[in-house]
């Protein structure tokens, strides 16, 4: 087995960077090893306009000590109009993010009726202008079936808007894999946690709130199917971490926040998984090439990340001015670490 590994232009196609002091504290974990990342718009005040997105991008870049391209997205609301979409396109923003209302953190201003006339009209304009539609696809039903119950909506949009590129974000259900095979314009992202864990890691040995996320971790069969898609670098699947930091105090209460903070360990942990399954030769394609192709990326900083096979202890917490954040794999040892970042 190789003792070192080079990755070129890692891409994270689903990332939560938050704002204010939290943004300042966590940004380096993503900006340093990744060339670019799709930045989620679900802030306390959602990013619903081009002006807001550009201001947020400037804030992110002002805090970067390395070359990094934030790929901004617009929070889709029923009030989004063609002029705003044109402004976004002219500013280099190509991603719309659709949240079903109340489906996850910061989605209170999301869309209530997925297929109403207003929403379909926005899809039509988005198709015309060449946008990518990224969707947190969950119903309001039983928590383990929410993604599956949303699949007919994905199918409807894919059928009626065949030139609109649609992303099933943070795919968690093996039945979603079957759907992306049916429609040429339907793609997906996969997280580290959905390919390495299942519901047993949340509830099997006592409740672990640090593994609680949306969409929920599913069954062992789901995990295995998604893992194989990653290990094989499925042509329609890109890596998207959905790294979502919450303070420890927000996770450890009676209404614990949904989200897993994986940014500090992403590349070493992925190297560990792919090495264990003798698939290191597919990691470059999964972590970068698929995103560049599926999102038609043309402008991003060139980076080479060198990893080495050596014990890498994960700290018990990440300290911020606001309090502690518990990272994924806290207080365990990874078998790979980042040795060098050429940027």
From Swiss-Prot:
Instruction: Tell me where in this chain the PTM N6-carboxylysine is found.
Output: 97
Q: What are the UniProt keywords, alphabetically?
A: Hydrolase, Metal-binding, Pyrimidine biosynthesis, Zinc
In this protein, the active site sits at: 242
A molecular-function term among this protein's GO annotations: zinc ion binding
- Give the pathway annotation: Pyrimidine metabolism; UMP biosynthesis via de novo pathway; (S)-dihydroorotate from bicarbonate: step 3/3
Q: Where does this protein hold Zn(2+) 1? A: 14, 16, 97, 242
Q: How is the cofactor bound?
A: Binds 2 Zn(2+) ions per subunit.
Q: What is its EC number?
A: 3.5.2.3
**Which EC class is this protein assigned?**
hydrolase
Catalysed reactions listed for this entry: (S)-dihydroorotate + H2O = N-carbamoyl-L-aspartate + H(+)
Which cofactor does the UniProt annotation name?
A: Zn(2+)
Q: Name one GO biological process term.
A: 'de novo' UMP biosynthetic process
**Residues annotated for substrate binding in this entry:** 16-18, 42, 136, 246, 258
What are the binding positions for Zn(2+) 2 in this chain? Answer: 97, 136, 170
> Listed GO cellular component terms?
cytosol
Looking up Gene3D superfamilies in the UniProt record yields: Metal-dependent hydrolases
The UniProt similarity line reads: Belongs to the metallo-dependent hydrolases superfamily. DHOase family. Class II DHOase subfamily.
Q: What NCBIfam families is this protein classified in?
A: pyrC_dimer
Subunit-structure text: Homodimer.
Function noted in UniProt: Catalyzes the reversible cyclization of carbamoyl aspartate to dihydroorotate.
Q: What is the name of this protein?
A: Dihydroorotase
| The organism of origin for this protein | Helicobacter hepaticus (strain ATCC 51449 / 3B1)
* Organism lineage string: Bacteria, Pseudomonadati, Campylobacterota, Epsilonproteobacteria, Campylobacterales
From the UniProt record, report the name of the gene that encodes this protein.
pyrC
């Amino acid at each position: 087995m190789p003792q070192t590994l080079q990755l070129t232009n890692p891409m994270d196609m689903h990332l939560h960077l938050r704002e204010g002091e939290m943004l300042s504290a966590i940004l380096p974990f993503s900006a340093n090893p990744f060339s670019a990342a799709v930045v989620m718009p679900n802030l306390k005040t959602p990013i619903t306009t081009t002006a807001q997105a550009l201001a947020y991008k400037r804030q992110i870049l002002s805090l970067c000590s390395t070359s990094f391209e934030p790929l901004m997205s617009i929070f889709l609301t029923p009030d989004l109009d063609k002029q705003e979409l044109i402004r976004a396109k002219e500013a280099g923003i190509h991603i719309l993010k659709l949240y079903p209302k109340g489906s996850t953190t910061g989605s209170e201003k999301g869309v209530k009726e997925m297929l109403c006339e207003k929403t379909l009209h926005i899809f039509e304009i988005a198709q015309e202008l060449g946008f990518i539609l990224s969707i947190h696809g969950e119903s309001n039903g039983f928590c383990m079936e929410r993604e599956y119950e949303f699949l007919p909506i994905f199918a409807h949009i894919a059928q009626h808007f065949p030139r609109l590129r649609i992303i099933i974000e943070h795919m968690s259900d093996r039945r979603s894999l079957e759907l992306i095979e049916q429609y040429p314009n339907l793609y997906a992202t996969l997280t580290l946690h959905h390919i390495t864990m299942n519901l047993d890691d949340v509830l099997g040995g006592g409740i672990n709130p640090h593994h609680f996320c949306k969409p929920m971790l599913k069954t062992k069969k789901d995990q295995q199917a998604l893992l194989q898609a990653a290990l094989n670098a499925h042509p329609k699947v890109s890596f998207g971490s959905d790294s979502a930091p919450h303070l420890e105090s927000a996770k450890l209460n009676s209404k614990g926040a949904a989200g897993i903070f994986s940014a500090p360990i992403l590349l070493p942990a992925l190297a560990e998984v792919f090495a264990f399954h003798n698939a290191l030769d597919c990691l470059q394609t999964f972590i970068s090439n698929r995103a560049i192709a599926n999102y038609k990326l043309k402008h991003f900083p060139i980076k080479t990340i060198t990893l080495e096979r050596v014990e890498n202890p994960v700290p018990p917490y990440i300290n911020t001015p606001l309090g502690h954040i518990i990272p994924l794999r806290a207080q365990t040892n990874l078998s790979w670490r980042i040795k060098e970042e050429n940027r």
